[in-house]
Amino acid sequence: MNNEESNAKLRFIISGGGTGGHIFPAISIADALRRRYPECEILFVGAEGRMEMERVPRSGYEIVGLPIKGLDRKHLLSNYKVAIAVIRSMRLANKTIRNFRPDMVIGVGGYASGPTLRRAHSLGIPTLIQEQNSYAGVTNKLLSRGAHKICVAYPEMDKFFSPEKIVFTGNPIRPEIEFGHPSRSESLRFFGFEQSESPVVLVVGGSLGALTINKSIADKLGKWAESGVHLIWQTGKNYIETARKAVENHPGLKCYVNDFITRMDYAYCAADLVVSRAGACSISELCLLGKPTILVPSPNVAEDHQTKNALALSTRAAAVLIPDTEAIELLTDTALSLVRDPAELSSLSEQIRTLAKPQAADRIVDEIARIVEHEKRAN
């Protein structure tokens, strides 16, 4: 059997999701697998009702949804439903793996990766985990015992995983962000701005929005209007109507506001300064592009991992960190002061760029290829 015939038969399952921070890296890995093995088959396994069930098919891949849910830590008595969902998910994961017969299963974190990778382990199918954050999630920590390799984006992850399994690859970046190079004038036009000397601030709260960041901007729109700074504001779907009404009350404000920005390559290119949550994949994009950044970590995430992500940058003078509890008071004034300080913007850009790990998806596929080849030789 020649190499092309062997590659044509390769099948991969990619499992996980829940937020853009899991889904976008998963899709980037899938795209890199297709570039390496054009004839391979890829199946996603996600969680019913979560974002991946829409985003993955839109990217051209099939997906199976498991009825998995997370634990309700506030109402522990209701978790019997979670236990039932886990049992059903294990059965469906077993059926999916047996029918699809993958050569390898890749876990990207999130509820669905648990049943899928556990079943793969029990069937002797090799697995690889991609951990996006500087503080490993519970699911990935549990699954790491059976994984062949664990691809990480931060140093010092041996406090969570076996050192011999760790590969420092960085986080996969969406191809349009990593490889797209739009012009600034084109980017400004997309948001309805004319080419001018006015600085631009991009405010994003992750794929689901961020209430504190939104309120911090909405409550101080008068200052934004007076400053002459142009504002690109992604609110998430839950805040968009409130934000639009607030913007209408400030006719002098130069602001593009939407619930979701379809062209983040344009948004990053146009921005002189970015205000963002501290999700791992957002940080990886900002590092790669060298964007001066204010990070406002979400307090509503497991084990406060966004604060740990943000500290990994702020302690290196690579970003400004504002705690969520202080954002309403400090965020607008800090952003408006910083965006008018070219020396500080330049310093932040230099420092954040040193943390970039380009072509992470291809590095991860390198590890996948080594494991697949090793399994072929062993069998």
From Swiss-Prot:
> Which InterPro entries does UniProt cross-reference here?
GlcNAc_MurG, Glyco_trans_28_C, GlycoTrans_28_N
Q: Where does UDP-N-acetyl-alpha-D-glucosamine bind?
A: T19, G20, G21, N133, R174, S207, I261, Q306
Coiled coil (UniProt feature): none
A GO BP entry is: lipid glycosylation
The pathway noted for it is: Cell wall biogenesis; peptidoglycan biosynthesis
- Kind of enzyme, top EC level? transferase
The protein's superkingdom reads Bacteria
Q: Where in the cell is it found?
A: Cell inner membrane
The answer to whether UniProt assigns keyword Transit peptide to this entry is no
How would you describe this protein's topology in the membrane? Peripheral membrane protein
Catalytic reactions of this protein: di-trans,octa-cis-undecaprenyl diphospho-N-acetyl-alpha-D-muramoyl-L-alanyl-D-glutamyl-meso-2,6-diaminopimeloyl-D-alanyl-D-alanine + UDP-N-acetyl-alpha-D-glucosamine = di-trans,octa-cis-undecaprenyl diphospho-[N-acetyl-alpha-D-glucosaminyl-(1->4)]-N-acetyl-alpha-D-muramoyl-L-alanyl-D-glutamyl-meso-2,6-diaminopimeloyl-D-alanyl-D-alanine + UDP + H(+)
Pfam families reported for this sequence: Glyco_tran_28_C, Glyco_transf_28
E.C. code: 2.4.1.227
Extract one GO cellular component term from the record: plasma membrane
Note whether Disulfide bond occurs among the keywords. Answer: no
Assign the protein's first listed, main location to one coarse class.
membrane
Q: Name one GO molecular function term.
A: UDP-N-acetyl-D-glucosamine:N-acetylmuramoyl-L-alanyl-D-glutamyl-meso-2,6-diaminopimelyl-D-alanyl-D-alanine-diphosphoundecaprenol 4-beta-N-acetylglucosaminlytransferase activity
Summarizing the function annotation, the protein's role is: Cell wall formation. Catalyzes the transfer of a GlcNAc subunit on undecaprenyl-pyrophosphoryl-MurNAc-pentapeptide (lipid intermediate I) to form undecaprenyl-pyrophosphoryl-MurNAc-(pentapeptide)GlcNAc (lipid intermediate II).
Q: Which PANTHER family match?
A: GLYCOSYLTRANSFERASE, UDP-N-ACETYLGLUCOSAMINE--N-ACETYLMURAMYL-(PENTAPEPTIDE) PYROPHOSPHORYL-UNDECAPRENOL N-ACETYLGLUCOSAMINE TRANSFERASE 1
- Protein family per UniProt: Belongs to the glycosyltransferase 28 family. MurG subfamily.
This protein's name: UDP-N-acetylglucosamine--N-acetylmuramyl-(pentapeptide) pyrophosphoryl-undecaprenol N-acetylglucosamine transferase
**Encoding gene per record:** murG
